[in-house]
Amino acid sequence: MDNQSDLAIVRRAYAKQTLAAARISDPRLQTAFAAIPREDFLGPGPWLAFHVPGFYQPTVDADPVLLYVNELFGLVAERRINNGQPSLHAALLAAAAIQAVV
């Protein structure tokens, strides 16, 4: 998906679904998850998606839309180092109750 406006729609849906999976309602977190490109933390695709019972499978191509799911992606798969599960990140950020400094 090359169209940035289409990818922005995908990111907004991802943010809403991620917070719902974590059972969180926080507009600031939802905005943050929608605004920050996940692919910036994963390097160039195709990417390695982690699947239970413990193996990584490459994405079909390097389309960043494939990253906007509540799944782990391998950074160093042979060492089982991944980027972390988005809903867990959301839950931890919500629990931290970070406040804006003005």
Residue ranges and their predicted role:
Residues 1-102:
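Class I SAM-dependent transferase core
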